[in-house]
C-alpha cells in the first residue's frame, strides 16, 4: 500500500505543481484549458474573462499549498499525517465551490471540475489513510 500511496501522491503533487507554473507563466492557457473542458460537453461559451491578478495570486497560493502538502505527506507520512486534514478540506472546498457555481450558473466546466475534485479528495483520503494504517 505504501508504493501505491507514493505513486498516487506523486501524480497528485504534479497535478498541482505543474498548474502552478502554468498559472504563473501562462494564465490565459489555464483559462483556455478550463474553457475547452466545457466545450467538450456544451456549445455554450464560458461567460467570464477570468482576467484578475487578485484571483490569479490566490489561485497560485491555493494550488501551491495543495502541491506542497502532497510532497510533505510523501516525505514522511507518519510525521506529517496531520497535514492530510487541511489538504482534504482545501480540495473539498474547491469541489463544493464548483458545485455552487454550477447550481448558480450551469456551465459544464464547473460540474467537470466539481467531479474531478471530489474524485481527487477520495483518492487523497483513501491512499493516505491506508498507507498510514499499514505503517502502524
Kindly give the residue locations of the regions a language model identified.
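N-terminal signal-anchor transmembrane alpha helix
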Residues: 4-26
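Core segments of alpha-helical transmembrane spans in multipass integral membrane proteins
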Residues: 18, 37-74, 88-89
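Membrane-helix interface motif
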Residues: 25-35
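Juxtamembrane helix-break-helix junctions at the cytosolic face
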Residues: 67-82, 102
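Membrane-helix boundary connector in multi-pass membrane proteins
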Residues: 78, 95-113, 129
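Hydrophobic alpha-helical membrane segments
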Residues: 82-98
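Membrane-water interface at the C-terminal end of transmembrane alpha helices
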Residues: 118-136
Amino acid at each position: 500500500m505504501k508504493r501505491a500511496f507514493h505513486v498516487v501522491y506523486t501524480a497528485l503533487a504534479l497535478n498541482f505543481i505543474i498548474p502552478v507554473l502554468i498559472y504563473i507563466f501562462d494564465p490565459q492557457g489555464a483559462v483556455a484549458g478550463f474553457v475547452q473542458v466545457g466545450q467538450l460537453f456544451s456549445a455554450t461559451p464560458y461567460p467570464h474573462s477570468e482576467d484578475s491578478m487578485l484571483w490569479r495570486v490566490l489561485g497560485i497560493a491555493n494550488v501551491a499549498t495543495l502541491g506542497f502538502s502532497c510532497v510533505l505527506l510523501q516525505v514522511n507520512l507518519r510525521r506529517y499525517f496531520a497535514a492530510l486534514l487541511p489538504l482534504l478540506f482545501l480540495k473539498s472546498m474547491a469541489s463544493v465551490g464548483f458545485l455552487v457555481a454550477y447550481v448558480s450558473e450551469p456551465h459544464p466546466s464547473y460540474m467537470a471540475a466539481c467531479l474531478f475534485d471530489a474524485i481527487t479528495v477520495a483518492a487523497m483520503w483513501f491512499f493516505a489513510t491506508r498507507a498510514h494504517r499499514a505503517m502502524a
